[in-house]
Amino acid sequence: MFKGTPEIVTQRREEIVNACEELYQTKSFKEINLKEIGAVTSFSRPTIYNYFQTKEEIFLALYEREYDRWNAELESILNSGQNFSRKQVAEKIAMSLERRAQLLRLLSMNNFDMEANSREELLASFKRAYGRSLDLFRKILEKYCPEMSSEEVKEIMYVFFPFMFGIYPYAEVTDKQRKAMEEADVDYIYHSIFEITYNCLIRLLDR
């Protein structure tokens, strides 16, 4: 790791992650490499190795940042000061994920590669952000659904968080995939991230 001031290290890491995020808007995980990321930053590719050893570590940092952003939204729901109904809780959480399509994309498509090819300390940092999401989600259910037992809350979480892996592929369909579905005569109804998430949550909460 580069032995600069904490401010410089943070600034450089942020610039690298921002470059990765910019490329990820138009390219796939496999298409992006360190050379391309370096071309978007203000410094050379060798400098990147002072902060990240692999492409996957950069994506993991982006992934962690996406969880941090979602956590901020979950905190807002938790601390709203309002008494939400179960329907409103489902709507609020679904809308929070509607705004986090990039998080769901990373989760569904690149999760294994990022974790497998990153150093343990960076993976631990990411897991803390992920763990915060679990904690906030649990607290939201405990606050707005107080009649639920702790076991019921756990059961909902064990269903919903694995369910999140499949949201993006169902909601974000490419033109090629859509055309193939039409040619295969598959009667498929397309739904948004919000719709898919809400429909799952309202069924889990109203059991």
For each feature predicted by the language model, list its residue ranges:
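Basic, helix-initiating cap at the start of DNA-binding domains
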Residues: 1-27, 35-36, 40, 79-81
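Helix-turn-helix
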Residues: 15, 30-57, 61
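Alpha-helical DNA-contacting segments of helix-turn-helix folds
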Residues: 59-66, 115
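Hydrophobic alpha-helical connector segments
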Residues: 61, 75-103, 156-160
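N-terminal hydrophobic signal/anchor transmembrane helix of membrane proteins
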Residues: 70, 85-105, 190-207
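Amphipathic alpha-helical segments used for helix-helix packing
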Residues: 99-121, 175-180
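C-terminal peripheral helix-coil segments that are non-catalytic and often amphipathic
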Residues: 135-139, 143, 147, 163-207
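Membrane-interface starts of transmembrane alpha-helices
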Residues: 145, 149-157
